[in-house]
């Protein structure tokens, strides 16, 4: 829908803006609802969530323009997505590249306690920094994807892998820890998913609905793999005193494999063997 509503030449930026609801919710609504549930009653929290959902549905019904000119999707045609080399390589890139985010986030409290030597009371600040980073990263992904259609996702993934790889050095002091957390938010919580989504839509052709869904499938599988690998690493005390940050380093190593998948995909496009199934001309002509 974001791609359909985008003005010409700004598809990526519009898709990224459509995804801003998630980081805004993490930054504002999640802490607010948590406070309501703890201070008042959990029933009020669920009531506010239901009310916000109803308001969102009403807003879409009132303000979204009619999209009668969009042809109904054909399930068989959508399934042809799995024969699309660019889409498959992008999905594998996300599958291997994103697991380190959960490896870092799962044990960040223990990292703060055992390595940075700070109180767990700073965790609200940590989560807020990740939320702010996610907001910045989503904006960044939109602008970068419009300027560098094939280069945006590799740049984002390369930065994310590097940030995870250097995490044992960055979590030693409070200042560098906060910088690390913010950067993980920018390139992990924000820019990664948004730039991956834009690339999938760009190459999916008439199967954009399924491609958008598979984006979430790939990242959820990355969550499973990242959490499993992280748990095994901690269980076997890999890294000694640094065992709670080692999952992020392992995530960087696996993420490098994902980056290889992505660079192969970009090579096929740059060499002319694959062509993006762009629909820029139809976007905005409604």
How should each PLM-predicted stretch be described?
Residues 202-240:
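A late C-terminal transmembrane helix in Major Facilitator Superfamily
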Residues 38-50, 231-256:
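A membrane-interface helix-boundary motif in multi-pass transporters
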Residues 1-6, 190-204:
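Intracellular juxtamembrane helix-capping segments at the cytosolic ends
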Residues 50-70, 261-265:
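C-terminal membrane-cytosol helix-exit motif in multi-pass small-molecule transporters
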Residues 151-196:
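C-terminal transmembrane helical hairpin of 12-TM major facilitator-type secondary transporters
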Residues 87-128:
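Extracytoplasmic gate region of multi-pass secondary transporters
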Residues 137-149, 234-235:
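Helix-to-loop junctions at the C-terminal end of transmembrane segments
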């Amino acid at each position: 829908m974001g791609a359909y509503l985008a003005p010409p030449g700004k598809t990526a930026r519009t898709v990224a803006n459509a995804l801003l609801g998630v980081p805004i919710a993490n930054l504002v609504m999640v802490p607010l609802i948590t406070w309501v549930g703890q201070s008042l009653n959990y029933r009020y929290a669920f009531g506010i969530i239901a009310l916000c959902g109803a308001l969102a549905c009403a807003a879409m019904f009132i303000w979204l323009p009619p999209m009668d000119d969009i042809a109904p999707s054909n399930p068989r045609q959508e399934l042809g997505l799995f024969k699309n080399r660019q889409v498959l390589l992008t999905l594998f890139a996300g599958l291997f590249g994103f697991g380190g985010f959960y490896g870092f986030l799962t044990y960040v409290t223990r990292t703060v306690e055992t390595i940075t030597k700070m109180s767990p009371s700073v965790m609200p600040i940590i989560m807020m920094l990740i939320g702010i980073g996610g907001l910045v990263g989503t904006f960044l992904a939109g602008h970068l994807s419009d300027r560098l259609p094939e280069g945006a996702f590799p740049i984002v993934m390369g930065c994310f892998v590097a940030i995870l790889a250097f995490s044992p050095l960055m979590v030693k002091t409070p200042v560098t820890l906060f910088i690390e957390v913010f950067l993980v938010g920018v390139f992990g919580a924000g820019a990664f998913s948004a730039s991956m989504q834009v690339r999938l839509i760009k190459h999916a052709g008439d199967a954009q609905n399924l491609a958008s869904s598979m984006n979430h499938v790939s990242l959820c599988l990355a969550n499973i793999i990242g959490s499993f690998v992280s748990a095994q690493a901690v269980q076997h005390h890999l890294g000694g005193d640094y065992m709670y940050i080692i999952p992020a380093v392992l995530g960087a190593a696996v993420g490098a494999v994902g980056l290889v998948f992505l660079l192969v995909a970009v090579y096929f496009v740059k060499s002319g063997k694959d062509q993006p199934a762009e629909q820029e001309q139809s976007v905005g002509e409604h």
